[in-house]
Amino acid sequence: MKKVSTWMYTLMQPIASFLLKIVYQPKIINKQAIPKEGRIILAGNHKMLLDPVLVSCGTRRLIHFLAKDVFFTGVRGFFMRRAGTLPVHSGKIHKDSFKSAIDILNQNKVVGIFPEGTRNYTEKQLLPFKRGAVTLAQETGSKIIPFAIHGRYLPFHGLRIEFGKPIEVESMDLKEANQLLEDEVRKLLDKAEKEKAGEKNKK
């Protein structure tokens, strides 16, 4: 396996996480769902470029995120490659990235994926999930921890992330596994909406 550089993540993640917590004061729910060791895939919805930092607030473990290859250019690409990020080509996991992700998981590390494949700028709650997360889970026997990011990306406006219970998809049909993951993320988003509505009614 080609060594994946991570020194930039180790250096910058604590700083970025600290600043995000000060500015946005996000509510982080059920972060104990992420085990302190073992191979894990974190998978959830995607709205903004800040999402990887927000997800990383839930664990001290280093997360190898997958990102579009178009971001791997110039200065930004330099930093992303040294933050342990793996490129995704044309909306699909490139075979080299897929192999790298498998190797990372087989070393009992953490991979982060946004199964929508892009940031969701629509009014829809979720875009259709691509199958990269469940495919990796089945290839490596990894559990998937779904997460849902909810709220406005403005300072002090109730931004939150909730991690769900780990799901196992190793013995499932790929299509059914992908639907299960999407359903679990949707449940977390629905829960956040209900809680937000309840808070408004109390005012």
Name each model feature, range by range.
Residues 28, 73, 95-98:
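Structural motif corresponding to alpha-helix initiation and N-cap regions
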Residues 21, 36-92:
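Catalytic core of membrane glycerolipid acyltransferases/transacylases, capturing the structured
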